Amino acid sequence: SSKLHFSDIDFGESETQRIYGAHINYGIKRVEWLESNIGLLDLRVFPPLRLGGASLISALSLLENTRALVIDLRHNGGGHGEAVSLIASFLVDDIRPLSGVYSRPLDLLTSNQTYPYTLGKPYGKDKPVYVLISRETFSAAEALAYDLQALGRVTVVGETSGGGANPFEYKRIHPQFVLWSVTEK
């Protein structure tokens, strides 16, 4: 199974590469043209753009000429919010606000938005897009589904998501224990 478990994380220098790297295709499980010219994009994790941005752009660009798009986030545990902005940017025609993040330690609200341009042809605002979610949909994956639904851009289909659309920090406090602390909401 390609599902990531926290026990697989070594929390060392190579952590980001291990979680989001090429060995898991930067979270892109499947890109497919289905019958009736429907595009399918199955994403398992949202990589930092410095690692997986080019792969995300390529995947989205491969589906640009489909008549409808299904984004499968049912097994996506989240990842980097900048990937949310990138994906959302392909699905709208202008800069749009996305959910923000409030930092408790800094007492600072950071607003997120779609990017003013994409490095591929945008999918556009008129073709139907469906986002599949499940209780395994978590963190940044939940944020993408929520943001696009709030913009009226997608139809969300599935179960109630797992939640967790808030950034956190973690510290290894023992070889067998990790402390996860939500720092933003």
Residue spans for each PLM region:
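Extended, small/polar residue-biased N-terminal targeting/export presequences
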Residues: 1-35
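STAS-typified acidic loop motif
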Residues: 25-53
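Terminal peptide-recognition signature
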Residues: 41, 71, 129, 148
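Active-site-proximal beta-strand/loop segments in catalytic clefts of secreted hydrolases
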Residues: 43-46, 72-75, 103, 132-136, ...
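A short, well-ordered alpha-helical element
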Residues: 49-67
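Short, glycine-/small-residue-enriched flexible loop/hinge segments at domain edges that mediate gating
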Residues: 66-80
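Short, well-structured beta-strand/strand-turn elements
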Residues: 69, 152-165
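Gly/Ser/Thr-rich loop/hinge elements
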Residues: 79-132, 166-174, 183
